[in-house]
Amino acid sequence: MLIFFNKYLHINLNILSYIPYRAIFSLLTSFFINLYIGPYFIYYFKKLQTYQIIRNNGPKTHYSKKNTPTMGGIFIIFSILFSTILYCNLSNIYIWYVISILIGYGLIGFIDDYKKIKYKNSQGLKLKWKYFFLSIIAFIFICMIKINNKDIISTELIIPFCIKNDFEINYLYIFLSYFVLVGTSNAVNLTDGLDGLAIMPVIFLTCGLTLISLFSDNINISHYLHVQYVKNSTELAILCMAIVGSGLGFLWFNSYPAKVFMGDVGSLALGGSLGAIAILLHQELLLIIMGGIFVFETISVILQIISFKIRKKRIFQMAPVHHHYEVKGILEPLIIVRFWIVSLILLLISLISLKVC
């Protein structure tokens, strides 16, 4: 929006023409918005009794969280949208693709949270309907970018740590994009089980995508680093920084002991947005490395289900795996910080892959 005012109202704020400045302003704006509105949202959430529903079969340490409000993802989404609309060039179609996923997946998460709170159970939206709506939005997203800009979704798969890192997979790419969107949103959702556990890996991952969006828009740098050239992708860096700032602002209230949880409205929206950005940048496989914590959590659930159905035995004492460590007696803050450390290391490994060959 500021770009529009600067161009057509002749305000002549040259600083707005520089991506790094707008990215920094975007981060700071979303951060301070959350710091300011966070306490108000938490107050009204408590007043409306939007408390987190605790599973009866969950870790006993979680019973102390039963009076902690959820749905904090609402003010995460608000601050991201505010900063994005304020600082991004809104004529850039990539921005609208990500915003559509942010709002669409956020709405599904909101309905899920609302049903949990209303009916006082941890089930919420039925699983089949949840995946149905997530899938519908994912396919609409894929079809729209395929129709409007065929260059965004080429059918080449970029494989990290390979000398020849682009492989033609034809229309399998559409299904890969679908699984990235739906999978990432649910992976973040599964990880969001401890205070601050999910939001910091989201921040790290978004920082990595920020760098790639900057590299991808320069044909010489992208060729040197073996990343896909994506024209005008630098605007995504501003949106990414809005996510980082919003995440840091939310962490202010979500760090142990949490005053608010993001809920499904936040985790599905953030996970879906990261998946969408990775698709636009052609970094679907690199996303798996960057978001290795989310992959680990998801695999732990899948293995637990398969093992119990086939062997009638559990691999972990409880899944997702962060609950396994809780049951083993490891303190929650230790689990959280250690997962953060692993997430940071995975980010660094993924960045090394850009010029490993």
From Swiss-Prot:
PROSITE patterns on file: MRAY_1, MRAY_2
Gene: mraY
Record's bilayer topology term: Multi-pass membrane protein
Annotated catalysed reactions: UDP-N-acetyl-alpha-D-muramoyl-L-alanyl-gamma-D-glutamyl-meso-2,6-diaminopimeloyl-D-alanyl-D-alanine + di-trans,octa-cis-undecaprenyl phosphate = di-trans,octa-cis-undecaprenyl diphospho-N-acetyl-alpha-D-muramoyl-L-alanyl-D-glutamyl-meso-2,6-diaminopimeloyl-D-alanyl-D-alanine + UMP
Gene Ontology biological-process annotations: cell division; cell wall organization; peptidoglycan biosynthetic process; regulation of cell shape
Role this protein plays: Catalyzes the initial step of the lipid cycle reactions in the biosynthesis of the cell wall peptidoglycan: transfers peptidoglycan precursor phospho-MurNAc-pentapeptide from UDP-MurNAc-pentapeptide onto the lipid carrier undecaprenyl phosphate, yielding undecaprenyl-pyrophosphoryl-MurNAc-pentapeptide, known as lipid I.
Transmembrane spans: 23-43, 70-90, 91-111, 127-147, 171-191, 196-216, 236-256, 260-280, 286-306, 334-354
Database matches in HAMAP family: MraY
Cofactor: Mg(2+)
UniProt keyword list: Cell cycle, Cell division, Cell inner membrane, Cell membrane, Cell shape, Cell wall biogenesis/degradation, Magnesium, Membrane, Metal-binding, Peptidoglycan synthesis, Transferase, Transmembrane, Transmembrane helix
A Pfam family assignment: Glycos_transf_4
Biological pathway: Cell wall biogenesis; peptidoglycan biosynthesis
Protein source organism: Buchnera aphidicola subsp. Acyrthosiphon pisum (strain APS)
GO molecular function term, any single one: metal ion binding
Entry's family note: Belongs to the glycosyltransferase 4 family. MraY subfamily.
Keyword Ribonucleoprotein (UniProt): no
Cellular compartments annotated: Cell inner membrane
EC class (word): transferase
Xref: CDD domains: GT_MraY
An example Gene Ontology CC term for this record: plasma membrane
Enzyme Commission designation: 2.7.8.13
Name of the molecule in the record: Phospho-N-acetylmuramoyl-pentapeptide-transferase
